[in-house]
Amino acid sequence: MQVTLAGKVAVVTGAASGIGLAIVKQYLASGIAGLVAVDLAPNMPTSLTELSQDKRMHYVGGDVGTDDTAKRFTETAITHFGKIDILVNNAGINVVKPLHLHTPEEWDLVMNTNVKAMYFSGRHILPIMMKQKSGVILNTGSISGETGIPTQGAYGPSKGAVHEMTRQLAIEYAPYGIRVNAIGCGTIDTPLVTRSAIDSGNPQAFMAMLKDNHPIGRIASAEEVASFFTYMASDLASFFTGAVLMMDGGYSAK
């Protein structure tokens, strides 16, 4: 079975590292016709520069928690490629604290990046997909959106909102041929996790703890997750919509 995205155009947020970067690479390798990579830095991050010679990819820098950024990445996709088939709402941020220790600014940062960004991207891209009578929206969810985890005071509620918005959008826009799904990730081997391990003071013990939390006995690679995002964006997944698909090594089954 060959998964192909030939002829399709995608917008991927949080594209400069971790899951997002792996998605960008796999979408390009899967024959996508055009891709707009979005991240916070105003200029293209070095992680993406090696891909910049591929004329199928364009970069937009900005805060996804603002309407202006969503407007700009939508316009970039339409200007260069004429359509948008796939939207990946992947940008996310976590403040690792109990709820009572979050400042109002930290709460807003998490909610704006993880939740409000989905409103802004949908506000601009959904009308295009509705006119096309087709489209796929994939949202990066989390085990924190399905079960309580200590120190996820804002992040957990934000991912719960991502999961519920996925269901809402799926029902609302199914008549227009638009599929909406979320991938509920467990712990993924990304630079963020590596930094957290270093900050813990005992990286080996920290990583061992993360692995032990997953019944499968390990954490996932960003490439594994990107492979599933590629399948879910393809026509092979045409009957999936409204699903929160847990890719968590058995974590949520405990």
Protein language model regions, located:
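Alpha-helical segment proximal to the catalytic Tyr-Lys
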Residues: 127, 171-175, 238
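Active-site loop immediately N-terminal to the catalytic Tyr-X3-Lys motif
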Residues: 97-100, 147-153, 175-176, 217, ...
